[in-house]
């Protein structure tokens, strides 16, 4: 009787754990921007960027990675941000060819 009760408890625990894992959406972003930098960053300092467009985040953003390995959130609507992304895209295309 005790063995079957222990087995039942283990089975229920395993079921609850698997339900929690399945309930987690796979597309939860690992990073969101809550504050945007207002300061223009020199293109020479930038290494790469990442667009944050998930509806799970409070706002759309671009995260620039600098050569000093800093991450800076900026507004993707800013003209200088769009120019910097274009520059980095062209730079990465030249490196690939």
UniProtKB/Swiss-Prot annotation:
Compartments, record wording: Secreted
Primary subcellular site in the record, as a coarse category: secreted
Origin superkingdom: Eukaryota
Matches recorded under Pfam families: IL8
Entry keyword Disulfide bond: yes
KW Disulfide bond (keyword) present: yes
Gene Ontology terms: cellular component: extracellular space
Disulfide pattern: 32-57, 33-73
Signal peptide (from-to): 1-23
Stated family: Belongs to the intercrine beta (chemokine CC) family.
Known function: In response to the presence of allergens, this protein directly promotes the accumulation of eosinophils (a prominent feature of allergic inflammatory reactions), but not lymphocytes, macrophages or neutrophils. Attracts eosinophils in vitro but is not responsible for eosinophilia in the ovary. Binds to CCR3.
Name of the protein this chain belongs to: Eotaxin
Gene that this polypeptide is encoded by: CCL11
């Amino acid at each position: 009787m005790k063995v079957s009760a222990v087995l039942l408890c283990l089975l229920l625990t395993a079921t609850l754990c698997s339900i929690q894992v399945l309930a987690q959406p796979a597309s939860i972003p690992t990073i969101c921007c809550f504050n945007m930098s207002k300061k223009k960053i020199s293109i020479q300092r930038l290494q790469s960027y990442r667009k944050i467009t998930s509806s799970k985040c409070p706002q759309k953003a671009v995260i620039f990675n600098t050569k000093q390995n800093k991450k800076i959130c900026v507004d993707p609507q800013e003209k200088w941000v769009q120019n910097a992304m274009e520059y980095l895209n062209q730079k990465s295309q030249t490196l690939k060819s």
